[in-house]
Amino acid sequence: MTTIDLNCDLGESFGAYKMGNDDEILPFVSSINVACGFHAGDPSVMRQTVEKAMQHNVAIGAHPGFPDLIGFGRRNMNVSASEVYDYVLYQIGALDTFVKAAGGKMHHVKPHGALYNMAATNPEIADAIAKAIYHSNPSLLFYGLANSEAFIQAAEKYNITLVQEAFADRTYKQDGTLTSRTEENALIKNEEEAIKQVLQMVKEGYVNSVNGEKVAVQAQTICLHGDGEKAVQFARRIYRTFENNEISICTPK
């Protein structure tokens, strides 16, 4: 049977501001990426998200981003590799403490937003993230964009496990990178199209680029976004689609 991990970014609320549909999404995913206070989240939200994830037996990962609350971590920053290392190590440590306090064990690290996209094409940034993971806990898995040579080489250098990721509702360019959110066609808003894309990636190993060309994708995890209007409905449909197609949802080891 084909197996796949379903991951989602959660814990993005901050103070009085509520983001996402965390409680409703949790039953349909196998792993989550928790914001660590830089681009979103706060200490109380981090603790609550960890505790809820453990109740659902969902794997918990850190979701470190740039220190950019206003831009939600989606704006590129002109920072050095050394600064990226510090940012990521700091955020991993913060979440790991909450996980340990709840009696759990952290599973993975997935960079967020602009940090993720920069690392996918910038070997120095990817290296800094991988080094921070290695120095924090080399058994942590590294979630990164499928086919990214920068991610692959960084994981190999530090002998950490890379879990290659694809996206359910994002479009792809010919080189296998994600279409920038600044472009109109970055998101797939039609549920049927998104489900078709996911099945192509999981069962057939490819995705159609925005130019209509087939791009090989060997994904081990699929990211669902939990903050859209129909996010819960979409998560439920993906979950049932996998069941109907004999695709087992499970956490990567």
From Swiss-Prot:
CDD domains: LamB_YcsF_like. It catalyses: 5-oxo-L-proline + ATP + 2 H2O = L-glutamate + ADP + phosphate + H(+). It comes from the Bacteria. Transmembrane segments: none annotated. One of its GO terms (molecular function) is ATP binding. The keyword Transport does not apply. The keyword Oxidoreductase does not apply. InterPro entries: Glyco_hydro/deAcase_b/a-brl, LamB/YcsF/PxpA-like. Keywords: ATP-binding, Hydrolase, Nucleotide-binding. It is an enzyme of class 3 (hydrolase). Its EC number is 3.5.2.9. Gene3D superfamilies: Glycoside hydrolase/deacetylase. GO terms for biological process: carbohydrate metabolic process. Pfam families: LamB_YcsF (PF03746). NCBIfam families: PRK05406.1-2, PRK05406.1-3, PRK05406.1-5. Belongs to the LamB/PxpA family. Forms a complex composed of PxpA, PxpB and PxpC. Catalyzes the cleavage of 5-oxoproline to form L-glutamate coupled to the hydrolysis of ATP to ADP and inorganic phosphate. This is 5-oxoprolinase subunit A.
